[in-house]
Amino acid sequence: MKVSMSLILITFWALVTIAKAYDPSPLQDFCVAIDDPKNGVFVNGKFCKDPKQAKAEDFFSSGLNQAGITNNKVKSNVTTVNVDQIPGLNTLGISLVRIDYAPYGQNPPHTHPRATEILVLVEGTLYVGFVSSNQDNNRLFAKVLNPGDVFVFPIGMIHFQVNIGKTPAVAFAGLSSQNAGVITIADTVFGSTPPINPDILAQAFQLDVNVVKDLEAKFKN
């Protein structure tokens, strides 16, 4: 009996853990997010409007036909369509981005703490990849993508995309969260507020402390 009860408890805990790993499933047709809490219901971090007052515009966005501006340090631009742009996405567990890359531009190493990403390339040539966890010996999974190719970045894995062509590239990606979140590794480590003690980073990255200070100066917000 003790063994059976232990198995039940382990199974229950596993199910609870899985349930918390992704956006909760909706318990209604939709839950259009609003900022005004008056007469609203709080779900998934957003207040929901009365469903009888929902309209088509709550489920609509435009502009993904427009190229993003890529004249920045990394030569790329991410245009996000999540619950902040389409309030009707609230509780639906999905969002979308358009990524524009200048020649030799990149979407630098980053991670989405709340979502798996599936990317399709529609223009140009990209070198993409992700690195697995310490438990899997930090293996690199990488491919060169051409238009029509698709690649998946598992939830939480550090990943990147680089335009290896001489012409602009365009990709679209779906994310398994209404608000996937993004942590850009270099910005986070070297550009935190307040900054991480450079001695800590020097030891962690096996760098001279002056090199770390220079990096922190480059990434300072």
Swiss-Prot record:
May play a role in plant defense. Probably has no oxalate oxidase activity even if the active site is conserved. Mn(2+) binds at residues 110, 112, 117, 159. PANTHER family: GERMIN-LIKE PROTEIN SUBFAMILY 3 MEMBER 3. CDD domains: cupin_OxOx. Residues 1-21 form the signal peptide. Keywords: Apoplast, Disulfide bond, Glycoprotein, Manganese, Metal-binding, Secreted, Signal. Oligomer (believed to be a pentamer but probably hexamer). It is found in: Secreted, Extracellular space, Apoplast. Pfam families: Cupin_1. This is Germin-like protein subfamily 1 member 15. GO terms for cellular component: apoplast. Coiled coil: none annotated. Disulfide bonds join 31-48.
